[in-house]
Curated annotation (Swiss-Prot):
Family: Belongs to the SPC25 family.
Organism: Kluyveromyces lactis (strain ATCC 8585 / CBS 2359 / DSM 70799 / NBRC 1267 / NRRL Y-1140 / WM37)
Keywords: Cell cycle, Cell division, Centromere, Chromosome, Coiled coil, Kinetochore, Mitosis, Nucleus
Chain coiled-coil ranges: 40-125
Gene of this entry: SPC25
Name the record gives this protein: Probable kinetochore protein SPC25
GO CC field: Ndc80 complex; nucleus
């Protein structure tokens, strides 16, 4: 090999090494930028996983390319031992980065599995609470002889079941629950305002809905019998 050929080869190797150096710098910058944002949300974490997988594939492909070019360089020039060591260093660095990405992917997988378990526990808790609420409503209806409807927004109507075979009209009372304090918006038969005030004051003081409904039924029954 002539000196000119060796110099030309050395220039090519230096240029190749510079390209590798710039590629790794850009890789490190890209990874550092993406690492700052992938914790923002669950959807971002999933996107990050896919991006990391793509980057991992790129690194693996680039590693293969480097190894092929390195082997070719070894066959062409045995004099560039120093450059060969640099290639080995770059390859080891790429392998280290790939292992780091594998660890990051494992961490994200674990985090997503934990979040999935948390969501499942929350779902089960809500289902349990919903079942509990339904059972409490059914208990009220059984104990007090009534059924409950919510035909209007923020309003609950309690229809009292008759203890006799034929009672007309049906006894009922409607509570507005949209405000901090309850309000009686309707009843059948119509309750005097003084009785409404007394019922609402007792409910506000005790927060005992069962006692409120018993008292309301008693007043409504008395008004029905009086007519």
């Amino acid at each position: 090999m002539g000196i000119d050929d060796f110099n030309e080869l050395k220039l090519k190797m230096d240029d190749f090494q510079s390209k590798i150096h710039q590629f790794l710098i850009k890789n490190n910058q890209d990874l550092a930028t993406k690492s700052e944002t992938y914790w923002n949300s669950e959807s971002e974490k999933i996107k990050k996983i896919e991006a990391l997988k793509d980057k991992l594939r790129q690194l693996e492909e680039h590693q293969i390319s480097l190894e092929e070019e390195f082997e070719s360089s070894q066959r062409e020039v045995s004099e560039v031992n120093a450059q060969s060591k640099a290639f080995l260093t770059k390859r080891d660095k790429l392998i280290g980065e790939r292992e780091f990405l594998h660890k990051e992917l494992d961490k994200l997988d674990i985090l997503l599995k934990e979040q999935t378990k948390d969501l499942e526990r929350e779902k089960q808790s809500r289902l349990l609470q919903s079942s509990k609420d339904t059972n409490e409503v059914a208990l009220f209806e059984t104990l007090l002889g009534l059924h409950i409807s919510a035909n209007a927004q923020d309003a609950i109507t309690f229809h009292f079941t008759s203890r006799t075979v034929d009672v007309s009209p049906q006894l009922s009372i409607t509570l507005d629950v949209s405000q901090d304090t309850y309000k009686i918006t309707d009843s059948n038969p119509k309750l005097p305002q003084i009785i409404k005030n007394d019922l609402l004051n007792n409910l506000a003081a005790t927060d005992d809905l069962r006692s409120f409904l018993k008292a309301a039924r008693s007043h409504l029954s008395a008004l029905t019998e009086a007519t």
